[in-house]
UniProtKB/Swiss-Prot annotation:
Record's protein name: Envelopment polyprotein
Stated family: Belongs to the nairovirus envelope glycoprotein family.
UniProt signal peptide: 1-17
Positions annotated with a glycan in the UniProt record: 25, 30, 80, 142, 413, 848, 1201, 1258, 1420
Chain residue ranges for the region called Disordered: 24-66
TM region(s), chain numbering: 547-567, 676-696, 705-725, 824-844, 1452-1472
Cytoplasmic side: 568-675, 726-823, 1473-1551
Amino acid sequence: MSKRVLIIAVVVYLVFTTQNQITGNHTTINSSSPSTTEASSTPTVSRTPQTTTTSTAVSTTITATTTPTASWTTQSQYFNKTTQHHWREETMISRNPTVLDRQSRASSVRELLNTKFLMLLGFIPKGEVNHLENACNREGKNCTELILKERIARFFSETEKESCYNTYLEKHLRSVSPEVSLTPYRVLGLREDILLKEIDRRIIRFETDSQRVTCLSASLLKPDVFIREQRIDAKPSNGPKIVPVDSVACMNLEANVDVRSNKLVIQSLMTTVKISLKNCKVVVNSRQCIHQQTGSGVIKVPKFEKQQGGTWSSYIAGVYTATIDLLDENNQNCKLFTECIVKGRELVKGQSELKSFNIEVLLPRVMKTRRKLLAVTDGSTECNSGTQLIEGKSIEVHKQDIGGPGKKLTICNGTSVLDVPLDEGHGCYTINVITSKRACRPKNSKLQCSIDKELKPCDSGKCLSISQKGAGHIKVSRGKTILITECKEHCQIPVPTGKGDIMVDCSGGRQHYLEVNIVDIHCPNTKFLGGIMLYFCRMSSRPTVALLLGIWIGCGYILTCIFSFLLYHLILFFANCIKQCRKKGERLGEICVKCEQQTVNLMDQELHDLNCNFNLCPYCCNRMSDEGMSRHVGKCPKRLERLNEIELYLTTSECLCLSVCYQLLISVGIFLKRTTWLVVLLVLLGLAISPVQGAPTEVSNVKQDGDYSICYFIFGCLVTAALLLKVKRTNSNGIVVVVDSFGRCPYCNEFTDSLFEEVLHDTLCSLCVCPFCEKQALDLVTLEEHVKECYKVATRKDIFKILGRKFTNALVRREKLFTTGLQLFINKTNVVVFALIMCFLLLLTGHNASAFDSGDLPDGVWEESSQLVKSCTQFCYIEEDVCYCPAEDGVGRKLLFFNGLQNSVKRLSDSHKLLTSVSIDAPWGRINVESTWKPTLAASNIAMSWSSTDIKGEKVILSGRSTSIIKLKEKTGVMWKLVGSGLASEKKKPFRFPIMDFAQVYNSVFQYITGDRLLSEWPKAVCTGDCPHRCGCQTSTCMAKECHTQECVSTHMVLGIGTGCTCCGMDVERPFNKYLGVKWSTEYLRTEVLVCVEVTEEERHCEIVEAGTRFNIGPITITISDPQNIGSKLPESLMTVQEIDDSNFVDIMHVGNVISADNSCRLQSCTHGSAVTTRFTALTALIKDDHSSGLNLAVLDPKVNSSWLSWEGCDMDYYCNVGDWPTCTYTGVVTQKLREFLKLDQHRKRLHTTLSFSLKKNLSKRSHTSVRLEGKTVTRMEVKVTALIEVDGMELHSKTIRLSGIRLTGLKCSGCFSCTSGISCSVNAKLTSPDEFTLHLRSTSPNVVVAETSIIARKGPSATTSRFKVFSVRDTKKICFEVVEREYCKDCTPDELTTCTGVELEPTKDILLEHRGTIVQHQNDTCKSKIDCWSNSISSFASGIGDFFKHYIGSIAVGVLGTVLPFALLILFFIYGDKMLWPFKVFCRPCRRCCRKNEGYNKLAEEEELRDIIRKFSKSGELINKDAKDKRTLARLFMSDNPKLKKEKKLSEIA
């Protein structure tokens, strides 16, 4: 009885205790700390239907403070508490099976089992797990410690791919799918699909209340990381106690801080050397297992025991990677202690002993702001894009069958270290250290960058100041200039050169679209000449020509004189050079026998021969004795002068061309100078006042379209000449002989070739007789069928041509009438007439057409534009420049905030930036502003023609249609002026059709990744047996060669010679260094166009056009065709290229360049010497060696080894080293492709020169990558669309309307001058009659212009407030506006039609604006006729001159007198010269005497002297005169005092 009572009491006690424990267990699970964010973040649901638990653990979290000196008492208490709980639960289940179901019992068994497994793996201290075997027996399982050891060994050793395991680590086939007892969870580094596929099969989670470890089986991941456990026995030595993390130089530790992601990555190369943590949270990746460890204690790594040959051996993970998040609060006081292993003395060559000393690794500390790190030079920032690749270190265990490039480190028996690889046979293991890439995983995926609107001064001038959270690349592009810069939280980037808006791509993918605030008024030299240049711009459409005209009037003749002087001496210089060159080949003159003097040249010798024989001096012509001749000639005072004359003559006569030019300058030089000045003056004047061929609308850096009217005229003349070849003129009686052209018979529809044949057809065919065979037909239908099949057509046609030519010529000669022949020609040559008409029309069209271009092609934000168009629908209403739409959830949001015109009132509705356009007609010229106000407009005005006009009361009802072909460029468009007929009062009602943007959309297919890869080789040798397969290559890109006999004495450890094998391998060590390229194949899909239709500010609609769209706004309907003439497209193959800086930081999203890849090698078809010999078909291949981001199963991805490398023409060999492993050599191998890849980037066609890309992003998702390309053509072959506008029943006010009571009040203006944002004005307008009228304003100042906007004035007690834009080119203190329609308000006073206000305009700031509105340009109206064009240009020129005189002189009359009178006197002086001094000679006798005196003693000009010298010689250059009767008289020709030379003046100095 007592036994039963005792048993019942025990059972009741156990039941009560177990229920409390279960409740506490559930509470513990639900309240588990979510601190394991690195390992898990996905909520999990337990199998219990009524209990929902959140599992936040992914990896083992060791929360207990465990140190190597932990007492056994603490461990015993821990195990007793755990086993007691499970034993009580087990007892309760055995006595009362209905308390928990089978799942609860299985969960209890699993917790006991996991505790045992973690003990055997070394993650928790060893101890007894009570009642585990009994619990397993009830489930039919064997859970003895020996069995569990064997299962763990098999789990980490057996590499059969089909081996799977359950929670008891029992092996089963993959086809058997056991029930997954736990819901899937996230594991750092593992994809969800792999986890769902392998959980509880080849991925096992060992989990207890406080620890979680996830391990991979050997069947899933090859267990190369496990090595025989070796205790490191290093000799103690002295060393530093505290070492900064960036100064650690230990053999057992590789530690580095990634400043871009705030991660401290610790690579342990000797896992038996303990690393102790204090107050840390670390994620440990030991390749086969991953766990998280929190608190203090030694970093745990998996190890197990394996029975081999009857003995148990301990295996441990040879390497592991520990990652510490420096921004985690749990790591604020983290400390790291370890034993630093370094090399000691060298035992033998290549082998050294180990020494050690204890150190504390000083970690970077995070400030409270969590923005900067102490003890880090650069500062630590978080990476902010998942497309970034960060460089780091990776370590692997290399066993005998594994090889690859990298730095090798071999540890033998825990006592020595070698630099060569050795395997377990020598008691060693080898660690390989390589450089790897890891992908950034930002915590915040919505990081953005902010841009300071004011430009900052920097070394390169002006820079953009950009701030962002984290580190990454920022791309700034402007036109064809692209800058990619690495930015860490804050950076300054120079403003790109060129024209156009600025696109900024942040690291996270956010795009900013900026414009420069400085307005370009297209009035040149305003910075230097100020307001004066504005008057020249108002005078002429060619202000530079007008400025040159003024300069030419004042300084033109001086310039012509200077040019003539330079030309004169330049010709003389070239003549001298030619003479000197020819003189070297000529012989000198001989010695004169008579005077005994050496003659200079042949002409001098001839002069001596003609004079010395008569005892005459050849230079002064004086007669003397023979003795006197020899004494006098050499010292004659005239000798040098005569020799200079001869030299000058020879100089000017050597080259005929130069001689002609020289004589021409001398004879007509003054006339040429005056004529040149006058002609240039007239040309400049004509150009200044001539009308322009439509104002050019291109930005200055874009090549403009020229005037093709001359080309059209020449083409028309050629066509006409070709058709007029049939008209031949002869001299027979002066008659024009006409050769007939083609005609057609109206009866038989047969073509006729002559007048004779036509008359024959008219005569016979009317009688139903065939003109060829003369057969009778029943009717005309039968005749027509017969003529088509008549067999005599060909022969009779030839006869008719001959007869027709004779008949026509005879007819014309007989009639003697040219008119008759001309009429025949006109009647019979309709083709020629049509051609002449077409040529004439082309000529007129070429003169009056206007371009629709509106500037350069800056990059567009296509996504924002598309969203904007889709958001602002017809259900929204428009106020000012904001589109308000009903909110879906009653919450307001604003896209593309528009500061300048944004209403400050917050509305509970969606608002979008309005798609407006401002058109400007500036009196100083056209305006061109690089803006982001989409769409800006080049208002090319087209007048509408009306097909019907009806009058109903004071209304005019108009209907009509028009068509326009528009060049497809973003931020451009066309504007129709709906000009009313003569009955309408409105002069114009603009109808705008702006094109916001357009893009060519492509479909892309990824081909491969390539780069300027770096190759590296490694040797491999074994003492006995065969070499490993492919020398241990683990990839498909390596090359290997082996020699089956080991002929080298490798080391002192190899005992035999010729008993082993040697091999060499070579593989890619770094896939890229300076260049990363991705090849794509593209397919053109479509061209999307964002267009808008705008009648007024209240009537606007936008749409994306693909296959034609129709808009309806009131009475106006517009139809748009498909895009046409799409000439420039992307090639079928292209390559995106990224240049990598010295930091080796890569962001695959920011593409720097796009080049054509049509001629590049295709997959597996290149030689080793080409640039793209290395191909990786998946991005996973770039990060396959990374272990700092969690478990890496990239090696299991088949795409990783689908890479390819060409080894054609390459070979490898080796040579022996005494006492060392052999050295590998190679031939034909290019180790790095930097030079080849650089040539590829430079020589291939760069596509951004022909297409402007609005989006160039490489995107990656898992192992797949894609590119988003949206571009537009920038070549001359531009895309076009056709727009058809139809107006049906548009109402305008008639001219009979009378306005009254117009009031303009409350004018307010504010803004800046010479800036893109301009001046914003508001005014209140009302009237008394009619009920509503559209008014327009214009400025009274020429420096201020008003946008072409309408002011709505309505009848009522309160005025209507209207807002409009104003632009000022200069600072002004007062702005006045007047009503354009003032002529319709007869009763209004000038004060009522004019309104003014004082303003304080801000100066232009050097800032950048984002999403702000402004103008691009406005094209001037075309004129109706040439006379009208010229009259308008002349009046504009005159008015500009008048404004200039008023402003700077004060009066037009004074300005005219002060300018025209000197100009007229200057012209008269040029025409009459010194003859204008005749009145002074008559009335002033002293002046007359002075003039006579000067005339007598005037020296000859240099030109006249040369004319006299040349006159003394004949054309052949001989010293002979036809009038000379004696040879002695020849000498007198050179005598200046000869009385026979009449009035020849004395020669001056000879040039």
